[in-house]
């Protein structure tokens, strides 16, 4: 009885055992080895492309904000009782609202920026972390209506400073790369969240 049972078991499992001695078995093994590398490659490609796209959208938002600010009058900058809490000039609030609207049109969470008040000191800085901000981070918008940068003019004894509007934007980005790199490098540690920053400067027209 025992011998008969062994033969029956061998008959059942022999086809499966043969699989592991064929070329198909080698391919399965190669796939198992390559799978973690493939996962890291796919997630890494997705992560970096998403970060690049976000950077481009932030660039555009900052550029639009600076261009808009440069065309606004500066006679209200000493009047910080117009909007927000703490209050800030109406022209600065207008820049905040434009940047917030641009982010939302680009399908980026504005973290509640449109309802935030600016810092009490210049340059005016808005910090927003509500509305389900990614990774529990913070969006930071800084509006400087009196930013001056040196411009070289031929024949001048020194640089001339051009009064401009500068908009700086910082946004949290959550990486997923660190979740899969563990397959290749156990114990490897990468930042889960980083701030992507950008700025734009446009000379004031006023």
Language model features by range: what are they?
Residues 1-24:
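N-terminal leader/signal peptides at the extreme start of proteins
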Residues 27-73:
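Aliphatic-rich helix starts adjacent to a transmembrane/signal segment
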Residues 2-9, 60-206:
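Short, conserved structural patches
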Residues 23-26, 39, 93, 194:
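Alpha-helical membrane and juxtamembrane elements of multi-pass inner-membrane transport
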